[in-house]
Structures are given as C-alpha cells and as structure tokens.
Design a protein with these regions (language model features):
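PEST-like low-complexity, intrinsically disordered acidic/proline/serine-rich tracts
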Residues: 172-192
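Active-site acidic short loop of glycosyltransferases
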Residues: 53-55, 85, 116-117, 134
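Thiol/disulfide oxidoreductase modules built on the thioredoxin-like
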Residues: 112-118, 122-165
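Short active-site neighborhood of thiol/selenol oxidoreductases, capturing the structured segment around
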Residues: 46-70, 76, 90-91
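Structural recognition of the beta-strand scaffold that forms the well-ordered cores
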Residues: 57-60, 89-93, 119-122, 142
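Signature tryptophan residues that serve as conserved aromatic anchors
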Residues: 41, 62-65, 69, 79, ...
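Structural microenvironment flanking redox-active thiols in thiol-disulfide oxidoreductases
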Residues: 70-114, 122-129
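N-terminal "domain-start" segment that seeds a small globular fold
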Residues: 8-50
Length: 192
C-alpha cells in the first residue's frame, strides 16, 4: 500500500473571526483524549493526561512532508517559546501520510532540522489521530487547564485568532502575566 493512514487530507486556508474571542465565544468541545498510543516520543518522555492537567495545551497534528504544516510551524514554535513560562505546553503529534514518514530516523532528523524543541508524539499507528477524530494536517486543538478542548483550527491561517485563544486560556488558568501582543512571524516559504 501507499502507507497512507485513514481518510486524511491536507487542509488549506481558513476563515478568520473578526476580533479576539471572548469567554463566551470559546465553546466546550468536550474532554481532550489522552495522548496514549504513540509509537515513540521525541524531546520528552510520554506525556499523560495527569501530567498535563492544569496546563494549557496546544496539540498540533502534523507530518514533516506537508507544506501546510511546515508553513504553520514558525507560529507553533513561536507560541511554544513565548508562552512556555506562562503554562502553555505544545505537543506535536506526527501522524505520517506516506510510508517514508513512518521511519523514526526520518522524523528525528526532521524534528532536529526544523528546530522543534517541544515534545513530539510519533503516532505511526494513528491512535492519537483517531482518538481526536482528526482528519486534517495541520490541525491544532487548544485544550484548557481542565483538559477540555475549547477551540480547534484546521489548515493554515487564523494565527491571530489562535494566539488570542492561547492568551485567553492562559488567563482562565490563572496566569497573571499573559503578554497581549501577537507574535510577528516572517514566514518565507519553508523554514529549514
């Protein structure tokens, strides 16, 4: 076979919401699934729901040969850096589209070459993908400190809205020093 996983497709651009989200505009999309079933973890030991409770979590489903994923990566990396000390945990979930993306050494090289320092779950069995009922790369799920999904975004774009969601969830979690500014990423093509 081609090595393709379950009904997957890359998501393109997305609609933007005018203005930043307020408390009432962030729905409760249900309890986030545990990040169980990864075949390997890079940059971290396996993360459990218990370890993540009390933290705001951004789960980023990606694969290293997806151009849309690579274009969102500078934003995800910048958020991970900017908000780490305020309680944000970014977890990359690498779900392969092609057979060569299942090879751990290829994923390790991509993570190193792309400068990804946050935890990456290698989801070669699509267990995390299926638990989230995910269908797209890239896909971002924003999880509050109580472990509930409060926002999701598929594809490129929506960066200001996504960052406002992170800020709001950190404030809800009790972080007092949330920087209200937005990151300025000069993403020119693929970051290498």
């Amino acid at each position: 076979g081609s090595g393709a996983g379950p009904a997957m497709m890359a998501a393109g651009g997305a609609m933007r919401m005018a203005g930043g989200p307020s408390r009432s505009t962030l729905p409760d999309e249900g309890l986030a699934p545990a990040l169980d079933g990864a075949t390997d973890w890079l940059n971290s030991t396996p993360l459990t729901a218990e370890q993540l409770r009390g933290k705001v979590v951004l789960v980023d489903f990606w694969t290293y040969s997806c151009i849309n994923c690579l274009r969102t990566l500078p934003y995800v990396k910048a958020w991970a850096e900017k908000y780490r000390d305020q309680g944000l945990v970014v977890v990359g979930v690498h779900a392969p589209e092609f057979a060569f993306e299942r090879k751990l050494s290829n994923v390790e090289k991509a993570v190193k070459d792309l400068g990804i320092s946050y935890p990456v779950a290698v989801d070669n069995g699509y267990k995390i993908w299926r638990a989230f009922h995910n269908q797209y790369w890239p896909a971002h799920y924003f999880i509050d400190a109580q472990g509930r999904i409060r926002h999701h975004h598929f594809g490129e774009g929506g960066y200001a809205e996504s960052e406002r969601v992170i800020q709001q969830l950190l404030q809800e979690a009790g972080s007092k020093q949330v920087d209200q500014g937005l990151i300025d990423v000069q993403a020119q093509g693929v970051q290498q």
